[in-house]
Amino acid sequence: MINRRHALGLLAAGSLLPPRSFANVSYQRSEFRDDLAKRFFDLATVGTFVGYKVDDYLIVASDKVRSGEAKLPASTFKIPNSLIALETGVVADPDKDIFKWDGVTRSIDAWNKDHTLRSAIAVSAVPVYQEIARRIGQERMQKYVDLLEYGNRDIGGGIDQFWLTGNLRIDPIQQVDFVDRLRRGVLPVSKRSQELVRDILPVTKVGDATIRAKSGLLGAEIGNPSLGWLVGWAEKGDQQTVFAMNMDCKEPGHIAARMTVTQQCLTDIGAI
């Protein structure tokens, strides 16, 4: 294990990624690849992909600029929101606690029903997670966002809006760091909460590989998507790769392309 501040400083010295303050992680080597950047060019958009190949202690990135740019996390914040809900007791059981539909018909049909935590994260039900955030409250939310060292830790802009339109920002490297700590079960919260969140993350099978990931789509709740995220990790045999991808969503096809381009990048680096 090496200090994350030192590791990211080395990456910056190598003109790959910017320095920032982190705790401990095993990153030791890094590279960026034009073939990954070309995946976004081929979609007529701009974006970034960062992969951490755990067994190789290798970070692979598509670029040295956007990979360090902090943006609103959108629904990728459902990962820490779920952890905090479980830690605070707002949710006791992700399969039994029911969040009743508020009766407001929204453009995404899957949101217009009752949900458990598991079903809500599966369809990325923003209203459910807004209610969860309100029940957690500003003080407890700030405490845990600080404890988890999540992004810039700024939850200004409204307790049910800060990850959608407010002040919270996180960059792809920070996403990889956070997700990797969840994957390893070393976040400063209970093992139970981490196990449950790992279990409820949406799963995609690609051949003999498994991808556990959460998407994000900035503006989805108002019908005006602009930025897409996908963060998580891929498992193939004993090999694991943690990743974060974001891209500008300039047309409807880019929404579905979030998973497609991520799979392409994971294939390019030999992760799946």
Give the ranges of each region predicted by the language model.
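A short, well-structured edge-of-sheet supersecondary motif
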Residues: 28-65, 231-234, 245
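N-terminal secretory signal peptides and thylakoid transit peptides that target proteins
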Residues: 1-14
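Short, well-structured active-site flanking segments
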Residues: 87-103, 189-193
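Mid-domain, small-residue-enriched loop/turn segments at the edges of structured enzyme/sensor domains
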Residues: 109, 113-117, 129-184
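Short helix- or helix-capping micro-motifs
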Residues: 116-124
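Structured C-terminal helix/loop/strand segments within mature extracytoplasmic catalytic/sensor domains
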Residues: 6, 25-37, 70, 134-137, ...
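Active-site SXXK
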Residues: 70-94, 120, 243
